[in-house]
Amino acid sequence: MIQKNTLLEVADNSGAREVLCIGLLGGRKSASIGDTIVVSTKSVNPKGKVEKGKVYRAVVVRVKNCIRKSDNSVIRFSSNAVVLVNNQGEPLGTRVFGPVKKLPSGSFMKIMSLAVEVL
């Protein structure tokens, strides 16, 4: 579960390395896979598309918390990770690194198509 002030890794090549969750969209207290959150960049690559300290939207693609699938198997990732998106929901980067859990019902299809592995 992701809440305010959670440090997250960035799983794309937009230029950000680490972001801080500063808000959750939809009036929730915690976010899970597929939810959109508001983040602030904390560390960036010098030649990236994003700037340090700027505010962006992001989609959660991996969480450390256990996720139960419909066949009662459990998936658990080693890190909390997000993909930065613009206001229309399109990813800022052109590649997504690491495995990605299947996002809910057709939303963010572009992120799933860019991912190396979809679970």
Swiss-Prot record:
SUPFAM superfamilies attached to this UniProt entry: Ribosomal protein L14
Pfam family, one: Ribosomal_L14
InterPro entries cross-referenced by the UniProt entry: Ribosomal_uL14, Ribosomal_uL14_bac-type, Ribosomal_uL14_sf
An annotated GO BP: translation
Gene3D superfamilies tied to this protein: Ribosomal protein L14 (2.40.150.20)
Ribonucleoprotein listed as a keyword: yes
GO cellular component entries: cytosolic large ribosomal subunit
Keywords associated with the record: Ribonucleoprotein, Ribosomal protein, RNA-binding, rRNA-binding
Domain of life: Bacteria
One GO MF term attached to the UniProt entry: structural constituent of ribosome
The protein's assembly and partners: Part of the 50S ribosomal subunit. Forms a cluster with proteins L3 and L19. In the 70S ribosome, L14 and L19 interact and together make contacts with the 16S rRNA in bridges B5 and B8.
HAMAP family in alphabetical order: Ribosomal_uL14 (MF_01367)
Recorded family membership: Belongs to the universal ribosomal protein uL14 family.
Task of the protein: Binds to 23S rRNA. Forms part of two intersubunit bridges in the 70S ribosome.
Alphabetized NCBIfam families for the sequence: rplN_bact
Protein name: Large ribosomal subunit protein uL14
Organism whose genome encodes this protein: Wolbachia sp. subsp. Brugia malayi (strain TRS)
